[in-house]
């Protein structure tokens, strides 16, 4: 299980910059900063209402660097320090003062072919990595990966939260979409279960070997 986007491997395009790689897509990073009073907008996190957010990757990185001490003693800090030092060769501890130098070094690396997603996958000797997708996902990126001829094994995992958690935003519409997608009547219990069986079979056919769940507690009623 890895928090990666299958589009990374399907496109195999260079990562745009250090902020787009380490901050904006990583909820372990931006949630920590948000919990300490940093606005998500200042980290480039899109708003639901479409209002403007910070787009300057260097400014986002500077905000991150100025508050990097907040990660002290966390697993996230260990992961980041390891990546900065061993993958990108950063020799300076990340601080407000060293922010630009580290940003520029990482960006210079990301421009090289050996730092593209598939190259990093191979460099790390990853045998298999599972992404996680909604039952409503067509898995187009996984289809493209299969057709590409690349030997790296990137599989999906079935994450049904949008259609099993009534508190999930858009739950009702998602259940209706599930029915339309599978041609099952999800207004009935049997039809709802049949729709899940249909999508699970599709995910399995696309390589899935597991499910993934985001329940905040073990309570079911």
Predicted regions, residues:
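Metal-cofactor-binding active-site regions of metalloenzymes
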Residues: 2-221
């Amino acid at each position: 299980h890895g928090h990666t986007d299958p589009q990374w491997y399907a496109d195999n395009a260079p990562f745009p910059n250090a902020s787009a790689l380490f901050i904006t897509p990583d909820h372990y990073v931006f949630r920590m900063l948000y919990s300490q009073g940093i606005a998500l907008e200042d980290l480039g996190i899109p708003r639901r209402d479409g209002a403007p957010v910070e787009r300057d990757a260097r400014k986002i990185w500077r905000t991150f660097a100025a508050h990097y001490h907040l990660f002290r003693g966390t697993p996230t800090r260990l992961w980041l320090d390891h990546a900065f030092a061993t993958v990108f060769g950063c020799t300076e501890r990340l601080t407000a003062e060293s922010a630009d130098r580290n940003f520029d070094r990482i960006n210079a690396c990301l421009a090289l072919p050996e730092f593209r997603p598939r190259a990093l996958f191979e460099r790390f000797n990853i045998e298999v990595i599972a992404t996680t997708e909604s039952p409503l996902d067509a898995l187009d990126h996984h289809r493209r990966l299969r057709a590409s001829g690349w030997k790296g094994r990137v599989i999906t995992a079935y994450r049904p939260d949008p259609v099993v958690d009534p508190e999930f935003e858009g739950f009702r519409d998602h259940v209706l979409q599930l029915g339309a997608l599978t041609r099952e009547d999800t207004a009935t219990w049997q039809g709802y279960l049949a729709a899940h069986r249909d999508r699970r079979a599709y995910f399995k056919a696309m390589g899935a070997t597991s499910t993934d769940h985001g329940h905040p507690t073990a309570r079911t009623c």
